[in-house]
Amino acid sequence: MGFIFSKSMNENMKNQQEFMVMHARLQLERQLIMQNEMRERQMAMQIAWSREFLKYFGTFFGIATISLAAGAIKRKKPAFLIPIVPLSFIFTYQYDLGYGTLLQRMKSEAEDILETEKTKLELPKGLITFESLEKARREQSKFFSDK
């Protein structure tokens, strides 16, 4: 009778362990999905920030360009136009980020790097797996239980 009881307990324990592993995998998948959602939202916020910044910077750039051009014409000193050059680079970059194709170009460049320069992207100890995470978790729990 004890053998039947222990066999049943072993099966229940095995089923519970399988359930826990499955649950841990689901939790990890959910965490990865959540991290991707957070990344997408951060990118959307960056684009929105760039568009909002462009409105204010565009106004400043327009007023500065008109003022500097008027000063250069009035004082007959073309050196007044020099600050327009770096301001135009900033304006162009922000416009390209907010409304242009900068993100698509960055994405295609990143995809190209992923395809052709794979060795530069390798992690120091290789890819993180569920098993390696479990091993580290077990070692950490042993460390805390020893103290």
Curated annotation (Swiss-Prot):
It is found in: Cell membrane. The chain crosses the membrane at residues 53-73, 79-99. InterPro entries: Plg-R(KT). One of its GO terms (cellular component) is plasma membrane. Pfam families: DUF2368 (PF10166). Keywords: Cell membrane, Chemotaxis, Inflammatory response, Membrane, Plasminogen activation, Transmembrane, Transmembrane helix. Expressed in adrenal medulla (pheochromocytoma). The keyword Cell membrane applies. GO terms for biological process: chemotaxis; inflammatory response; positive regulation of plasminogen activation. Residues 74-78 are cytoplasmic. It is a multi-pass membrane protein. Residues 1-52, 100-147 are extracellular. It comes from the Eukaryota. Its main location: membrane. Receptor for plasminogen. Regulates urokinase plasminogen activator-dependent and stimulates tissue-type plasminogen activator-dependent cell surface plasminogen activation. Proposed to be part of a local catecholaminergic cell plasminogen activation system that regulates neuroendocrine prohormone processing. Involved in regulation of inflammatory response; regulates monocyte chemotactic migration and matrix metalloproteinase activation, such as of MMP2 and MMP9. Interacts with PLAT. Interacts with PLAUR. This is Plasminogen receptor (KT). It comes from Rattus norvegicus. The lineage of its organism: Eukaryota, Metazoa, Chordata, Craniata, Vertebrata.
